[in-house]
Amino acid sequence: MGTDGMAGRAILIAGPTASGKSALALALARARGGVVINADSMQVYADLRVLTARPNPAEEAQAPHRLYGSVDGAVNFSVGHYLAAVGEVLREVWAAGGLPIVVGGTGLYFKALLEGLSEIPPVPEAVRTALRAEAEGRETAALHADLARRDPEGAARLGAHDRLRVLRALEVLAATGRPLSAFQGSRRPGPLAGMPCDKLFLVPDRALLRARIDARFLAMMEEGALDEVARLRARRLDPMLPVMRAHGVPGLIAFLDGALTREEAVARGQADTRAYAKRQVTWFRHQAGAGWRWLAPEAAMREAGG
């Protein structure tokens, strides 16, 4: 994890939620004069500091942090939006002679940073709104069947219950008349493509990780997660927006609506987060590409000098 010749260099820290990524990033930033850059698709949102485990003000005061809480919850912040924002931040950090430390659990963000992103035309808001209205009340499996009739190749790549991605594919079809796969051969290069990067993936003991996830959710409830979700609920945003689907949000909204008890909402949030952590590890194992070092969090902290 050296910093000699920092221009173009970066440290990337990934791993499942609650694995200690932020603590490692902060330790490295303090030791090496680095800038912590967010790579978590939920921590970009201003509405959810507690429930997304964003660094708190005391932590942010110890080192520069970028792209945390910078997006309003009403925005559907895509990978393309992230790539544009993070590219600008990386250039600023390098220009100042700093070391970017990119940390988070969103695999697609890291993949885009390193490999680039397909050039998909923007979908007009009128098209998106009309399609979402048409899809409201329909089962995701039925929407997937519609997609399969019009774009068999694209549908085969998506799960029959992955509503957001199925809708995205249908939107592109509606807006362009061409399947999503037609655009996936043309790629915008990633800002870290070919750059010298130290890539670390934290892998805690599974039983310990499950216990940490459950304990952290309880701590979030004590720290104001329910109030945070109540404020978000009061905004009456589209329930399909990413911020409304953050782990813990649907269950806590159901509690506020009287559909779940507090205990049921907490159990749902814990279970959803545990399942997400498992998916994160699986995704990185099969999709992240070469060059990642898999380390126990304790070993990574020792290496960082923390």
UniProtKB/Swiss-Prot annotation:
Q: Does the keyword DNA repair apply?
A: no
User: PANTHER family per the record?
Assistant: TRNA DIMETHYLALLYLTRANSFERASE
- UniProt name for this protein: tRNA dimethylallyltransferase
Q: Where does ATP bind?
A: G15, P16, T17, A18, S19, G20, K21, S22
Q: What class of enzyme is it?
A: transferase
**Binding site residues for substrate:** T17, A18, S19, G20, K21, S22
| Region entry Interaction with substrate tRNA, spans | 40-43
Q: Which residues cross the membrane?
A: none
What domain of life does the native source organism fall in?
Bacteria
| Any one Pfam family match given in the protein's UniProt record, by short name | IPPT
- Which cofactor does this sequence's record say it needs? Mg(2+)
